[in-house]
Amino acid sequence: MVADELTMDGTVTSIRPTIRAGHKTIIAALDPDGTPLAVGHYHPANGTTELGGIGTLPTARRQGLAAAITTALVDHARDRGVSTIFLAYAEDTVARIYARLGFRPADSTLLIANQPARS
């Protein structure tokens, strides 16, 4: 299991119980030496999920890995009964990848955290 191997920073260790319980799925594209090149995850609830954490190492970009990870996440979620799948993005280049995979804009969202109040 890849998640068992990725424990250096403690991130996977802290979510391992969630993964093992089937509440979160992480999919990764690995280099032959086991290095994660691209990853993504989803955490379904009541037939709905957001795809998140989709990213590719800079040295592994332009190989279709983000698209492959996204497609694998969608297929995995659909196979498990998830009917509504959404995601958010911040860059137009990423939006084009998602559009090619069948995602369409639904609305705009602005999320701001830890910002000082403006007068």
Regions found by a protein language model. Name each.
Residues 1-27:
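Internal catalytic-core helix/loop-beta-alpha segment
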Residues 17-59:
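A conserved beta-strand-loop-helix scaffold within acyl/acetyltransferase catalytic domains
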Residues 66, 70, 91-94, 113-116:
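Short glycine/proline-centered loop/turn elements that form peptide/ligand docking sites
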Residues 1, 88, 104-118:
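Conserved catalytic-core motifs of GNAT/GCN5-like acyltransferases
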